[in-house]
Amino acid sequence: TNMFGDILSDLTAELAGSLGMAASINAGTQYAMAQAAHGSAPDIAGQNIANPFSQVCSAAMLLTWYGQREGRPEFMQASQALEQAVTQAIAAKESTRDMGGKLGTKETGQALLKRLAA
């Protein structure tokens, strides 16, 4: 199993400030998969309190991987736009409680969409 890897990734995510900020991808030469570095949190399912930033940043990492692999700069630009939207949202406290904001998961996602549309 990867139990110790899971434990270490959770601990390092906490050092970074929140499990909700630990982005990752599993990548090979042909395929990649975006996922937040931490496990599921069934105890908060459906409560609108989960931090979506780790999954959004994981998607950004996947876009970068694909853009580099295929030589497609527009995918890398999309990745940068996602990362910039997350950075700006955190600075404006448009985030969930674990990041110092007062928004729920849905509202945080909507704030990111507004920043991407601007």
Predicted regions and their residues:
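Glycine-rich phosphate/nucleotide-binding loop
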Residues: 1-81, 85-92
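Glycine-rich phosphate/pyrophosphate-binding loop and the adjoining helix
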Residues: 72-77, 81-118
